[in-house]
Structures are given as structure tokens and as C-alpha cells.
Regions:
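A short, compositionally biased domain-edge/stem linker segment
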Residues: 1-4
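Alpha-helical cap/lid subdomain in secreted, periplasmic
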Residues: 6-9, 32-139
């Protein structure tokens, strides 16, 4: 995917998650959220045209766990198959704290993404609570 970016080929970078992806705590949230800042950093570092050929999709909804992420992946990211992202950054770890499936839904979401015909790259983002705890080991 990095070579695709460097070559100036059309590339789609998508972010799927909860309130952290939505931009909670960032002011203004649309410009200062981690998703936008990450997209801009990737474009600046890896593209010859500062991202003119890179599509940005942000699908963050506060309070949602990965169970809803599976549905939102189809609806908000791939738009029911019309879009094939090349990179998807997934952040649900905070909202999956009460996950009764012990990570099976999270795994199902990642498997669904990996099963796409274009085999997108996936980054799993695990936010850390103030006490340095996160769900990485549970998922």
C-alpha cells in the first residue's frame, strides 16, 4: 500500500470506530481528531501530491462497540461494496470493555475486512485508559 501511495495511485484510507475515531475531545473535532491527523500525516509523508489521490473516510460513532462496527463497515466504509479501502484503521477497544463474546465480535470484524477482494491492510488501534489499561490482551 505504501508503494501505491508513493506512485500516486488512487488510494482509500478509512477509519472505523467509536468516539475516539469520531473526534471526542478534539477541538474542532473534524479537523483535530486522530483520524484526520493520521490521514494528513500519511499523505504528507508518503504521497508526491500531498494526498490529492487519497480518499479519506471517517466512520466514528461514539459509544458503539465492534458489534455495530460490523454493520457500519458495510454501510459507512464500503458503502455496500461500492468502495474498497486500501487501509482501514479500526478502534473499538474502549467500547468493547463489556464485550460478552470475549473478542469474537472484534475478530469477526477484522476477518470480514480481510476477506475483501482487494485484501486491505488493517491497523488495530488500542486506546489506553488513564491507568495504562486497555483491552489489547482480551481481544
Amino acid at each position: 500500500m505504501l508503494q501505491q501511495l508513493r506512485d500516486g495511485k488512487p488510494t482509500t484510507i478509512a477509519f472505523l470506530g467509536g468516539s475516539i475515531t469520531q473526534g471526542a475531545g478534539a477541538v474542532p473535532s473534524q479537523e483535530m481528531c486522530y483520524a484526520r491527523k493520521t490521514y494528513e500525516a500519511i499523505c504528507e509523508r508518503y504521497t508526491p501530491d500531498h494526498g490529492a489521490h487519497v480518499r479519506y473516510i471517517k466512520a466514528g460513532v461514539g459509544g458503539t462497540p465492534c458489534q455495530l462496527g460490523i454493520i457500519r463497515y458495510d454501510r459507512d466504509i464500503t458503502r455496500d461494496g461500492a468502495v474498497q479501502p486500501d487501509l482501514i484503521i479500526v478502534e473499538f477497544a474502549v467500547n468493547d470493555e463489556a464485550d460478552e463474546t470475549k473478542g469474537l465480535m472484534h475478530e469477526s470484524l477484522i476477518q470480514k475486512i480481510w476477506s475483501a477482494p482487494n485484501e486491505p491492510a488493517v491497523v488495530m488501534l488500542f486506546s489506553v485508559f488513564a491507568n495504562d489499561w486497555n483491552l489489547k490482551d482480551r481481544l
